[in-house]
Amino acid sequence: MTALLELCNVSRSYPSGEEQVAVLKDISLQIHAGEMVAIVGVSGSGKSTLMNILGCLDKPTSGTYRVAGRDVSTLDPDALAQLRREHFGFIFQRYHLLSHLTAAQNVEIPAVYAGIERKKRQARARELLLRLGLSDRVDYPPSQLSGGQQQRVSIARALMNGGQVILADEPTGALDSHSGEEVMAILRQLRDRGHTVIIVTHDPLIAAQAERIIEIHDGKIVHNPPAQEKKREQGVDAAVVNTAPGWRQFASSFREALSMAWLAMAANKMRTLLTMLGIIIGIASVVSIVVVGDAAKQMVLADIRAMGTNTIDIHPGKDFGDDNPQYRQALKYDDLVAIQKQPWVNSATPSVSKSLRLRYGNIDIAVNANGVSGDYFNVYGMSFREGNTFNAVQQQDRAQVVVLDANTRRQLFPNKANVVGEVVLVGNMPVIVIGVAEEKPSMYGNSNLLQVWLPYSTMSDRIMGQSWLNSITVRVKDGVDSDQAEQQLTRLLTLRHGKKDFFTWNMDSVLKTAEKTTYTLQLFLTLVAVISLVVGGIGVMNIMLVSVTERTREIGIRMAVGARASDVLQQFLIEAMLVCLVGGALGISLSMFIAFMLQLFLPGWEIGFSLTALASAFLCSTFTGILFGWLPARNAARLDPVDALARE
């Protein structure tokens, strides 16, 4: 009869300092299918090491171990995990149930790693628990089960994938006598159903219930009677077979890893929340700085645009402060007409100005009188509170009309509802008020002088007596590049004058400078926020490293029931990612709350959350989870199952 399990000259030694300590010495053993074997020996005799080798949790240092004719030394770690998953079922003295799972969920674990569909494995788990008398304890956590009930759950878990070979390590060691008898009765029933049952024990009463007792002492077998041939029932419990396609197996595996990660997080709510806190603060900081910073930038740029950022000012001379008499009369009315004919010009206005006294009744105030065209207010995007600007006829006739700014109106007419039609004196010339304009803020701050505007022809001929212009302001059409417009303007006037006796000031350069400055500031603040996110990620890594240490035995249990190293890596990596993703979602919610509160106190701010910002936040949190979760996950996947199971 061919042996199911066969050890030939197997030895196992472990390093101890510079020496090797032999635990098993030249073991040769055959165990046939359907046997019930007891391995006995005193503590330290090597029986647990022998069981670990039989269960493919450990490999011999020398010698050969075959399972159903397959030499396990030729198998890689994934193949060994598959062998454990499909052929072996473990029953431990301390049950080794996962405390955050129910009885049914504990039983399902081997089938999860076998890739069995959820409905099939749930039905299988309930069937096994029903057979073992636990139908009313299916949804109970281990803490609500007695020792005997927990061991029966452990037996059901061992049978989940078929359990051709049952390895029971001191299965009654932690039970009272009655519960111990029940467990042994179940093991005998499994033997009768065709399972191979191997019991490791030091209790002679337990060993006596086996058909064959193998005694081990100081790493050597000292008693090994031959196997007894008996006719038994045929048909070991059939495992639930996975017939799903490869992509569906992968999707199912990922979904189950996600579910297990969520359960593990829920089992330690406070620790999970504290772990998330760093990510929440980091993501909230990044998102808040991006969206609030963008809102602040747009507000600043809007204020700058309101001053007329698509305007170009033309002044006589070489630069500001140049009072050379030969350049003073450089700009003429004909230059204005030529500029207005250019296709890229929206509007243009001349400007001549002088400080004068403005009088109405007994009120006498100083004002800055500006001679402009009717397009001036369009060039600077100014609106009217009352009345309107002067028209072409009034400009041509040098009409004695004036537009006041809001501050001037308030000084002259504090109690009048409508001032259009009132007559005031500008210098010594009477003029009629035809409008009140809302003045836009200046790039250089608001002057303390009050402003009034008259037709430039009126200002030049009637008040100043000059034929030249102090400056010309050009508004460029929307969509036209301001720099190119400035170059064309310079060429036009240079050709007209025969020389460059003027200079230009492009307000678009102010906008570009402001954009660059705000971008630099926002980038700096974002980098500061990213540092907080990195600190949060390091916190996740620290907690996950602690979690791996705390859950070492859990990792050993999962490997014993068939989890591959990649399964463990995937689970812990998903846990880290899930912590960061949930933390990222909470961080985004916090940033939205911050934005809402800011809008309550700063109603002028328009804070919006773009899909790009939200997607970037989730990508950041996912990347953080992968980056800082990989090291703990790798450490978990590299654990030796024997060492992991031995940890307290």
From Swiss-Prot:
Cell inner membrane is among the record's keywords: yes
EC primary class: translocase
InterPro entries attached to this UniProt entry: AAA+_ATPase, ABC3_permease_C, ABC_transporter-like_ATP-bd, ABC_transporter-like_CS, MacB-like_ATP-bd, MacB_PCD, Macrolide_Exporter_MacB, P-loop_NTPase
Record keyword Cell inner membrane present: yes
Enzyme Commission (EC) number: 7.6.2.-
MF terms (GO), sorted A to Z: ATP binding; ATP hydrolysis activity; transmembrane transporter activity
Annotated TM spans: 273-293, 417-437, 523-543, 578-598, 611-631
PROSITE patterns: ABC_TRANSPORTER_1, ABC_TRANSPORTER_2, MACB
Keywords, comma-separated and alphabetical: Antibiotic resistance, ATP-binding, Cell inner membrane, Cell membrane, Membrane, Nucleotide-binding, Translocase, Transmembrane, Transmembrane helix, Transport
Residues annotated as binding ATP: G41, V42, S43, G44, S45, G46, K47, S48
Pfam families tied to this protein: ABC_tran, FtsX, MacB_PCD
Domain ABC transporter positions: 5-243
Role this protein plays: Part of the tripartite efflux system MacAB-TolC. MacB is a non-canonical ABC transporter that contains transmembrane domains (TMD), which form a pore in the inner membrane, and an ATP-binding domain (NBD), which is responsible for energy generation. Confers resistance against macrolides.
Protein name (record): Macrolide export ATP-binding/permease protein MacB
